[in-house]
Amino acid sequence: MSKVAVIGATGRVGSTAAARLALLDCVNEVTLIARPKSVDKLRGLRRDILDSLAAAQKDAEITIGCERDDYVDADVIVMTAGIPRKPGQTRLDLTKDNAAIIKKYLEGVAEENPEAIVLVVTNPVDVLTYVALKVSGLPKNRVIGLGTHLDSMRFKVLIAKHFNVHMSEVHTRIIGEHGDTMVPVISSTSVGGIPVTRMPGWEDFDVEEAVREVKEAGQRIIETWGGSQFGPAQAITNLVRTILQDERRVLTVSAYLDGEIDGIRDVCIGVPARLGREGVLEIVPIELEEDEMRAFRRSVKVVKEATREAMEAISER
């Protein structure tokens, strides 16, 4: 049984993720972390989650805290704290401020808990996964970003609806930045084991429109609901369960590249990775068509530039 700490637990994503994580059979303690001025909210959230556990007849310990000692010993540290996007903002607009928040909470974690796994959710997630890796001192396999996991699921739903099949029949991935330069990997997408481009009705599927819908999903939710909540929370729960139960599933997350894909190095970006109890067990090499690789390299360039700016910003603080 494991302890999971959620930093930024009073936010939309953090609170919802905490409630869902507490229901996992592999989790026996969830620690809710927020700033000291939010301690009353933490108390209320704790009570609410305990009520949900009672209704589900699940036994788990829910603790609250505002200090490093409250979360640094967790098996998995889920980082959701940060300034959220406002209407009209891109995720990259949040880089410098949120990089400072990552540094505040995660700097030197490896010195106190070298076995911790950090899951970064805060945007821009690819950039901040790299920041978390560098400031925490943890090895590259133990720092993971939510990345394009949810984007891939959104794309999967659109394909399933178009071909009128169950989602489980669709295998697809979106790689690259969790943002405007994300890349759909059509060349390895299949429906019921059949390459998607050979499916009847493929010619009627507008890939560009589908990708645009995936890209704009978060912004539309911000404009109408105020911000993403349930989708990211479930995606977090999926990843934490996969890690703690050592499921060894291949999921698309933001992970550190060291030459595994076309020799690309020193960047955290959305790629297929095999996940288990030690975090990233393997970056799964993926064969891309020439146009997909060009698009992926463009995405890498964007993320690397934003990452450079983030690292410079935190070095000045």
Curated annotation (Swiss-Prot):
Ligand binding (NADP(+)): 8-14, 98, 121-123
InterPro entries: L-lactate/malate_DH, L-lactate_DH_AS, Lactate/malate_DH_C, Lactate/malate_DH_N, Lactate_DH/Glyco_Ohase_4_C, NAD(P)-bd_dom_sf
EC number: 1.1.1.299
GO molecular function: L-lactate dehydrogenase activity; L-malate dehydrogenase (NAD+) activity; L-malate dehydrogenase (NADP+) activity
Top EC category: oxidoreductase
Domain of life of the native organism: Archaea
Protein's recorded name: Malate dehydrogenase
Organism this protein belongs to: Methanopyrus kandleri (strain AV19 / DSM 6324 / JCM 9639 / NBRC 100938)
Organism phylogeny: Archaea, Methanobacteriati, Methanobacteriota, Methanomada group, Methanopyri
